[in-house]
């Protein structure tokens, strides 16, 4: 009651002529403030309906009254007029003789002057009872809807949920109604559409219509949505009498699509009965469901749909939704076909596809892309979202009206996999939103052999979607027309509100997990029922025949026509001799490769820049390009330091990155940097987004003020997610080769939170799916006494997954050896020791004639190290990325005197040079830095080893022996020198944890391996 009184008081100046829009704009503020302008001085028990959930209803009635006093029942008109006039407690139900303010004091003390209307009290209570009843159906109707085609479902129902809402007259008492009220006519509230054009209905008819709307084959979950307009929109779609009607032509189209879906699976079963195909039997309605969503979206202007789905029904979707040539699908079953493309390939039910065709319903062009995915369920979700975001970005689709995504899920995975939650929480973030995804859950009520009761703690597998206020439409999959209607509404919702929506197809799985599996072991009763279940095609065909929509011969002709199509495609499939995986590309890059998919050249131009370009970028990077913009004093000092560096023709790490990004923007290359806290940088070194200290939320991105016609620069702090965000950025990088897409981990240690994306997509993606990707991973790494969780990006894991052979020396005389190496590798792994080399490797990533993932172990302490500087001279035209940086000190002047050649990578180089100088051993010990670890620079390291004929070889690293680079580098160095010498080790001892958390222990370990590195007798005892 306090809630309503507060709202009424705040809104008292409004008149009935003011619009609902004005009311709704002011209402949230009123609700938030809870500041009473007027309140009753006495208890208000006389108006109990103002408390609890009824207050929401009263607010909605008040909203309608403000717009038009005649739109509500007379009793409400009296109540609102009296309340606005300041009536005392208990008298708001009554009509005062005068509503003038001069009489208010008299009203409070002269009750006898007020005309009594005792029946109004009863009227209000009755109408509130009806409102409670309607609201009960809207909130809980889905719990008693007939959703299970098998009729045995109880796993989705919480035991506390009543078996029905109204099934017997004694339940009416719960709502304050009685059996005698069934034929009484009640005025309908504004929060329901069951009346159609009728403002009032008998209670019996109200209940019947609510049962039809909410308790049949569709269950609607939406009352948790905190937006009145959206709730009203959904109510109108499901409550309006007769709204779910289909024309005969629509029914025939639906039948034809069911024929294709069903007969495709039956054809595969006949031809390859012993092959795994993860068929769609039991949910054949999925195909017409998807086609309906696509049809509706196409009609609303969408011309590109990007899809992601698991293995279940994938071949059917490829054949009947995306329209992949059937012979290309059938030949995948031929075990004798040889693979024409390099790489491992993948199972047929993992492959993706890209196809442009005419939508026959809308007669509009539409592009369909199904993203390839691994068996790791739901892992493709953020990838699809990222690709969708990229396609929207490149075509200027800022509202998602042209490009959209559809994600398919299994019930067990949707509830069980955390990546679903991570992906949902990207859905409305400014730099990640795709303006609404349609989620379709194939809910066959079982996960392999696990019952829902053991697979989730929530009533439905879709409950995770509630966190983003996505409406959830549950539907019985054996009612094809109900499914089609729900899919139409889902597509309309996405087009109207640009928010996520979930369609839960409650179905069953006619076979086991795969066609070779026996489900009766674990679900005997369920599968006894399934064996009796008539296929949905047969049931729907019988229905249409009985309705006279089609006749039996027409139905049989439709079946034979599609069977003939399959047989002809099967015959053509036998002519296929070679299996081309490249025909299954999900993200082609037109114009980037030659027609046969090869790079247009095998060279890489210089990655250096003209000096005036470097100066210009440096000037912008060290200034604020916006007037009247106040920055933090500490940031002013950082920008001053940058200006001094530019004046001295030098760059540090942050400035080198700035120049790499800025120069690519000048060349029309979009740069996108994403990750946790990347705008400022975890180590406060980047500052790509400046914040006005006097105006809240006013920001400036200087990088977008470099050139008049530059490409846009996107830098965005991500949600605190690695798995979801890295998957998203991988998908973004799939869309175009002409973009530098980078994901930075807050610390490299946290990359294993995204291990699935790294292991299943980035590392083997090209081998499995012939799909290149140029994503860049920036992984802060370095042993600096910060403990086991802030020290190691686990380089040993990335290096272990490199695909080169450590025991085979490649042909070092091959033309363009370094470029060919890059082309053949599965990813590039670097650990730069200078800002200049970091600058070059970022630019090389785009200037290469192909794309490979780039893994960069970035430094922490080197960000401000006084020796970690690069002169402009090393960044000018003609300069390149240095795969190896050789010794250039006294040792290189007289190499025959060198007794030990130390190989290292990254930050440890600065520890080694400091120690070498302290020991005065600059002529005896040479230090060579390996900047590119994979592909391994055999050619350059052979020259280094040959340069120092009298030196023993050692690898030095700051990581523990069983971690870091040693196990990767040692066999390759040995192969390089034809095993002529041993390669000794100087570094930390093996350990389980990546680093110690004790500063003293850290320094002790550091000094110990430095002693080993410069003790020229250290390895003699092993010789």
Curated annotation (Swiss-Prot):
Transmembrane segment boundaries: none
Named cofactor requirement(s): thiamine diphosphate; Mg(2+)
Entry-linked InterPro entries: 2-oxogl_dehyd_N, 2oxoglutarate_DH_E1, DH_E1, KGD_C_sf, ODO-1/KGD_C, THDP-binding, Transketolase-like_Pyr-bd
Binding site for thiamine diphosphate: 312, 411, 444, 446, 676
Protein name: 2-oxoglutarate dehydrogenase complex component E1
Enzyme Commission designation: 1.2.4.2
List of residues that carry N6-acetyllysine: 401, 970
Keywords, in A-Z order: Acetylation, Calcium, Glycolysis, Isopeptide bond, Magnesium, Metal-binding, Mitochondrion, Nucleus, Oxidoreductase, Phosphoprotein, Thiamine pyrophosphate, Transit peptide, Ubl conjugation
Annotated Gene3D superfamilies: 3.40.50.12470, 3.40.50.970, Multifunctional 2-oxoglutarate metabolism enzyme, C-terminal domain (3.40.50.11610), TPP helical domain (1.10.287.1150)
Residues annotated as signal peptide: none
Residue span of the annotated presequence: 1-40
Family, similarity comment: Belongs to the alpha-ketoglutarate dehydrogenase family.
């Amino acid at each position: 009651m306090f809630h309503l009184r507060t709202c009424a008081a705040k809104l008292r100046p409004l008149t009935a002529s003011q619009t609902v829009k004005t009311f709704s704009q002011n209402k949230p503020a009123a609700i938030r403030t809870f500041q009473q302008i007027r309140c009753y001085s006495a208890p208000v028990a006389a108006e109990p309906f103002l408390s609890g959930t009824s207050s929401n209803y009263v607010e909605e009635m008040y909203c309608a009254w403000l717009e038009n006093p005649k739109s509500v029942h007379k009793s409400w008109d009296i109540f609102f007029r009296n309340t606005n006039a300041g009536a005392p407690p208990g008298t708001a139900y009554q009509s005062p003789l005068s509503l003038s303010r001069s009489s208010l004091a008299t009203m409070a003390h002269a009750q006898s002057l007020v005309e009594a209307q005792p029946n109004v009290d009863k009227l209000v209570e009755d109408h509130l009872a009806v409102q409670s009843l309607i609201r009960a159906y809207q909130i809980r109707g889905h719990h008693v809807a007939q959703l299970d085609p098998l009729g045995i479902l109880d796993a989705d129902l919480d035991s506390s949920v009543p078996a029905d809402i109204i099934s017997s007259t004694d339940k009416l008492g719960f709502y304050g109604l009685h059996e005698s009220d069934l034929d009484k006519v009640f005025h309908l509230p504004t929060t329901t559409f069951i009346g159609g054009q009728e403002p009032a209905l008998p209670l019996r008819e109200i209940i019947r219509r609510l049962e039809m709307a909410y308790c049949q084959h569709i269950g609607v979950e939406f009352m948790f949505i905190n937006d009145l307009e959206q709730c009203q929109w959904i109510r109108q779609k499901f409550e309006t009498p007769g709204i779910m009607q289909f024309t005969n032509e629509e029914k025939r189209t639906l039948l034809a699509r069911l024929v294709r879906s069903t007969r495709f699976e039956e054809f595969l079963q006949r031809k390859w009965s012993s092959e795994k195909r993860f068929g769609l039997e039991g949910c054949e309605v999925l195909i017409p469901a998807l086609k309906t969503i696509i049809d509706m979206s196409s009609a609303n202007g969408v011309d590109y749909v990007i899809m992601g789905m698991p293995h279940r029904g994938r071949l059917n979707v490829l054949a009947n939704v995306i329209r992949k040539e059937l012979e290309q699908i059938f030949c995948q079953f031929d075990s004798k076909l040889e693979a024409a493309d390099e790489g491992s390939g993948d199972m047929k039910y993992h492959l993706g596809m890209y196809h442009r065709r005419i939508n026959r319903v809308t007669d509009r062009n539409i592009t369909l892309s199904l993203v390839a995915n691994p068996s790791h369920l739901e892992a493709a979700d953020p990838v699809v979202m990222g690709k969708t975001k990229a396609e929207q970005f490149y075509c200027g689709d800022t509202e998602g009206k042209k490009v959209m995504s559809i994600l398919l899920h299994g019930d067990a995975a949707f509830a069980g996999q955390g990546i679903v939650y991570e992906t949902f929480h990207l859905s409305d973030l400014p730099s990640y939103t795709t303006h609404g995804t349609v989620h379709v859950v194939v809910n066959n009520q079982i996960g392999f052999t696990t019952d829902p009761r053991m697979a989730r703690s929530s009533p439905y597998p879709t409950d995770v979607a509630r966190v983003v206020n996505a409406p959830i439409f549950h539907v019985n999959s054996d009612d094809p027309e109900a499914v089609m209607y729900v899919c139409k509404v889902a597509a309309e919702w996405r087009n109207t509100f640009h928010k996520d929506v979930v369609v839960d197809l409650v179905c069953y799985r006619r076979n086991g997990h795969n066609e070779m599996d026996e489900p009766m072991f674990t679900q005997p009763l369920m599968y006894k029922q399934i064996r009796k279940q008539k296929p949905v095609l047969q049931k729907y065909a019988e229905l249409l025949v009985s309705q006279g929509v089609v006749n039996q011969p027409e139905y049989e002709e439709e079946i034979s026509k599609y069977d003939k199509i399959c047989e002809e495609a099967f015959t053509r499939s036998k002519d296929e001799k070679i299996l081309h995986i490249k025909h299954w590309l999900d993200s082609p890059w037109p114009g980037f490769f030659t027609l046969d998919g090869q790079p247009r050249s095998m060279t890489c131009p210089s990655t250096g820049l003209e000096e005036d370009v470097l100066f210009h970028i440096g000037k912008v990077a060290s200034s604020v390009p916006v007037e009247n913009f106040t920055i933090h004093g500490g940031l002013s000092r950082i920008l001053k330091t940058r200006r001094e560096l530019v004046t001295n023709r030098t760059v540090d790490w942050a400035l080198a990155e700035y120049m790499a990004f800025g120069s690519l923007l000048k060349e029309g290359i979009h740069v996108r940097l994403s990750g946790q806290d990347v705008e400022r940088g975890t180590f406060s070194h980047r500052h790509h987004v400046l914040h006005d200290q006097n105006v809240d939320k006013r920001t400036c991105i200087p990088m977008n003020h470099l050139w008049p016609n530059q490409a846009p620069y996107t830098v965005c702090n991500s949600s605190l997610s690695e798995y979801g965000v890295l998957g998203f950025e991988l998908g973004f990088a799939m869309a175009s080769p002409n973009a530098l897409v980078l994901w930075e981990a807050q610390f490299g240690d946290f990359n294993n939170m995204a291990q699935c994306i790294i292991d299943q997509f980035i590392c083997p993606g090209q081998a499995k799916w012939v799909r290149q990707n140029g994503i860049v991973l920036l992984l802060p790494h370095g042993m600096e006494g910060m403990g086991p969780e802030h020290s190691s990006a686990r380089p040993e894991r990335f290096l272990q997954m490199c695909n080169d052979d450590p025991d085979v020396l490649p042909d070092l005389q091959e033309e363009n050896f370094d470029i060919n190496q890059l082309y053949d590798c599965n990813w590039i792994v670097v650990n730069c020791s200078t800002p200049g080399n970091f600058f070059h490797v970022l630019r090389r990533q785009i200037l290469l004639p192909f794309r490979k993932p780039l893994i960069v172990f970035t430094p922490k302490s080197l960000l401000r190290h006084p020796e970690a500087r690069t002169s402009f001279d090393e960044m000018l035209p003609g300069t390149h990325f240095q795969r190896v940086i050789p010794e250039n000190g006294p040792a290189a002047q007289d190499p025959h005197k060198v007794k030990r050649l130390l190989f290292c990578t990254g930050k440890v180089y600065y520890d080694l040079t400091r120690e070498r100088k302290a020991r005065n051993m600059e002529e005896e010990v040479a230090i060579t830095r390996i900047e590119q670890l994979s592909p391994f620079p055999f050619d350059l390291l052979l020259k280094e080893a040959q340069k120092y004929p009298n030196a023993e070889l050692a690898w030095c690293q700051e990581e523990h022996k069983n971690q870091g680079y040693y196990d990767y580098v040692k066999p390759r160095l040995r192969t390089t020198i034809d095993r002529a010498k041993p390669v000794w080790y100087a570094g930390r001892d093996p350990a389980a944890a990546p680093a110690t958390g004790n500063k003293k222990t850290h320094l002790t370990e550091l000094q110990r391996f430095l002693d080993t590195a410069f003790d020229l007798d250290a390895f003699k005892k092993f010789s």
